C-alpha cells in the first residue's frame, strides 16, 4: 500500500511536468520529423522504500521494462533477443530499412551497434558486431559500480555512463539516458539519472521504472535497501501526436503505487531472471496507446 496521500503521490510530479510542457513548451522540429513541445531541465524524486514508481494513470508495459533491463545487464546489443522474448520496443531501430537509412548496409538486422548494454559492460572495447564474445574486453562499469558500493560506499565516483563519444557514430541511436550516479547513506542505495532527451509520453514512464528497478536490484546484491530514484532531464518533450493522449492521461487520478519484491536471494547481478522480479498490487488505469517516433 502506498504511503502517500493523494496530494503527496509521487506520480503528480510526472503529471505536473506534462502539464507544464503542454502549457509552456516551445515548438521544435526534431530528428524524427514529428515535431515536439519542449522545455529544458526538469527533476523529480521517487521513494523506493515502501513502493515502486510504476505509473498508474496508464498501464505501463512492465514485462518490457524487466526484459529490456536484463538485456542491458547481459551487455546485449541484438534487438532480436528482445523480440524473441515478446518485447518489440527496439524492432524499428534494428530493422533493415532503418539500418540502411543510417548507412549500416553490412550490419545484420537487429544489430543496434554499441548501445547501452555494451557501454555498461564493455566500455572502450572495439565493437565488432553482435554474436561476438566480448568477455574481458573494455571496462565492466556495472561490475565496478557494484564492487565499489560493496567496498567503498562513501565514494563519490559511483557512476555508470553510456555516452561514449567515439562509439556514437556506430550506434543506431545515441543514448538518451546517459549517466547514472549512485549514493549510499544510512544503509540505503539511491540513484540519480541524467537523461539528455526524454519522450514524456512513451519513454519517461519506462525510464523511471527501469532505473528504479536497477537500483532495487543493485541494492539487493549489495545488502542495502532501496532509497530514492532522482530523475533529471535535459530536453523534456512531448511529441505533437501524443498531445491528445496525454491530455486524457491528465484527467486520471493516480492510484497507489505497486510494490516490488524478489522471489529468491540473488548475490550476483548477472543471475537475475525475469521470474525473480515480482511486482505486486499494480492496479493502473487502462493503457493509452501512443505512436513511437522513429
UniProtKB/Swiss-Prot annotation:
Gene Ontology molecular function terms on file: thymidylate synthase activity
Listed pathway(s): Pyrimidine metabolism; dTTP biosynthesis
Catalytic-site annotation from UniProt: 176 (nucleophile)
Keyword vocabulary terms for this entry: Methyltransferase, Nucleotide biosynthesis, Transferase
InterPro entries listed in its UniProt record: Thymidate_synth/dCMP_Mease (IPR045097), Thymidate_synth/dCMP_Mease_dom (IPR023451), Thymidate_synth/dCMP_Mease_sf (IPR036926), Thymidylate_synthase (IPR000398), Thymidylate_synthase_AS (IPR020940)
EC number: 2.1.1.45
Catalytic activity: dUMP + (6R)-5,10-methylene-5,6,7,8-tetrahydrofolate = 7,8-dihydrofolate + dTMP
HAMAP family in alphabetical order: Thymidy_synth_bact (MF_00008)
Subunit structure: Homodimer.
Protein name as it appears in the record: Thymidylate synthase
Organism: Saimiriine herpesvirus 2 (strain 11)
Amino acid at each position: 500500500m502506498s504511503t502517500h496521500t493523494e496530494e503527496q503521490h509521487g506520480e503528480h510530479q510526472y503529471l505536473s511536468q506534462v502539464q507544464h510542457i503542454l502549457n509552456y513548451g516551445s515548438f521544435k522540429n526534431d530528428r524524427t520529423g514529428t515535431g515536439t513541445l519542449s522545455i529544458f531541465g526538469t527533476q523529480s524524486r521517487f521513494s523506493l522504500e515502501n513502493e515502486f514508481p510504476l505509473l498508474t494513470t496508464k498501464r505501463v508495459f512492465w514485462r518490457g521494462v524487466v526484459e529490456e533491463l536484463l538485456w542491458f545487464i547481459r551487455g546485449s546489443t541484438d534487438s532480436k533477443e528482445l523480440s524473441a522474448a515478446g518485447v518489440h520496443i527496439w524492432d524499428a531501430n534494428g530493422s533493415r530499412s532503418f539500418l540502411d537509412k543510417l548507412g549500416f548496409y553490412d550490419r545484420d538486422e537487429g544489430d543496434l551497434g554499441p548501445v547501452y548494454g555494451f557501454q555498461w559492460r564493455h566500455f572502450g572495447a572495439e565493437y565488432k558486431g553482435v554474436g561476438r564474445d566480448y568477455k574481458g574486453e573494455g571496462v565492466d562499469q556495472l561490475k565496478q559500480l557494484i564492487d565499489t558500493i560493496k567496498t567503498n560506499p562513501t565514494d563519490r565516483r559511483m557512476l555508470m555512463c553510456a555516452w561514449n563519444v567515439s562509439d556514437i557514430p556506430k550506434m543506431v541511436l545515441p543514448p538518451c539516458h546517459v549517466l547514472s550516479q549512485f549514493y549510499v547513506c544510512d544503509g540505503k542505495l539511491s540513484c540519480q539519472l541524467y537523461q539528455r532527451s526524454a519522450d514524456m509520453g512513451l519513454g519517461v514512464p519506462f525510464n523511471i521504472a527501469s532505473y528504479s528497478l536497477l537500483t532495487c536490484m543493485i541494492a539487493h546484491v549489495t545488502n542495502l535497501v532501496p532509497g530514492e530514484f532522482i530523475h533529471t532531464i535535459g530536453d523534456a518533450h512531448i511529441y505533437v501526436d501524443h498531445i491528445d493522449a496525454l491530455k486524457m492521461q491528465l484527467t486520471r487520478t493516480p492510484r497507489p503505487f505497486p510494490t516490488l519484491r524478489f522471489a529468491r536471494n540473488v548475490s550476483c547481478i548477472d543471475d537475475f531472471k525475469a521470474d525473480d522480479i515480482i511486482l505486486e498490487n499494480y492496479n493502473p488505469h487502462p493503457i493509452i496507446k501512443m505512436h513511437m517516433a522513429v
